[in-house]
Swiss-Prot record:
It is found in: Plastid, Cyanelle thylakoid membrane. It is a peripheral membrane protein. Signal peptide: none annotated. Transmembrane segments: none annotated. Keywords: Cyanelle, Membrane, Photosynthesis, Photosystem II, Plastid, Thylakoid. GO terms for cellular component: cyanelle thylakoid membrane; photosystem II. This is Photosystem II reaction center Psb28 protein. The keyword Plastid applies. It comes from Cyanophora paradoxa. Belongs to the Psb28 family.
Length: 112
């Protein structure tokens, strides 16, 4: 089961918008996640410590996570996951394929 967490042990229910970019040689890439009104803001079981992508292969994580506030209230979370080589890229894609299938999501290639 593929899941996303901001607080370890607390699954995020909001489905993110994910944008991927990759270097021309495929050696590295970045995934940017945007969560509008994530459910983690409704949970008071600790602080957000990172973005954790968890599946049967293990865990991918990043500490590059930012919350956006409007009028003093949390509204969204943005996170970036950097992939430094082809193996990390392929591992991330496997996670996203599982997460997408589980949540009935699709992948759309950007138009040039």
């Amino acid at each position: 089961m593929a899941k996303i967490q901001f607080i370890q042990g607390v699954d995020e229910e909001a489905i993110p918008d994910v944008k991927l970019s990759r270097s021309q040689d495929g050696a590295n890439g970045i995934a940017k996640f945007y969560f509008d009104k994530p459910t983690v803001f409704d949970v008071y079981q600790g602080e957000i410590t990172g973005l954790y992508l968890i599946d049967e292969e293990g865990e991918l994580s990043t500490r590059t996570v930012y919350a956006k506030f409007i009028n003093g209230k949390p509204q969204s979370i943005e996170a970036s996951y950097i992939m430094n080589n082809r193996e990390e890229w392929e591992r991330f894609i496997r996670f996203m394929e599982r997460y997408a299938k589980q949540n009935d999501l699709s992948f759309t290639k950007a138009k040039n």
